[in-house]
Amino acid sequence: MTNAKMTFAVQFSERYINKYIGSPIDDLMVSMAGTTQSYQMRLKRSKDSRAMLTTGWNQLIDAKAFDEGDVCLFHFKEVDDVLVLKVHVLK
């Protein structure tokens, strides 16, 4: 799959993420809970100020890490002053 992206809700973006993305983060490490596989993604603001994962998101989709209809929980945290993201899939 090409050109896949994940866009977060405005309220979530404003409250939790936008303080980290004054400029895009080109090397956000994203991992799936329960695996050791990590993916490098780009986190940036969309034109309507929502946070958006772009480059690399399609790798998660191609890896069949989750299915349509699954609920995903996104856990952003700082590790050694670096923002990282762990994705939990609730089936």
From Swiss-Prot:
Coarse class of the protein's main subcellular location: nucleus
GO CC terms in record: nucleus
Keyword Magnesium: no
UniProt keyword DNA-binding, yes or no: yes
Transmembrane feature ranges: none
Record GO terms (molecular function): DNA binding
Cross-referenced InterPro entries: B3_DNA-bd, DNA-bd_pseudobarrel_sf
DNA-binding region: 1-91
Pfam families documented for this protein: B3
Subcellular locations according to the entry: Nucleus
UniProt-listed Gene3D superfamilies: DNA-binding pseudobarrel domain (2.40.330.10)
UniProtKB keywords: DNA-binding, Nucleus, Transcription, Transcription regulation
The name this protein goes by in its record: B3 domain-containing protein Os03g0164300
Originating species: Oryza sativa subsp. japonica
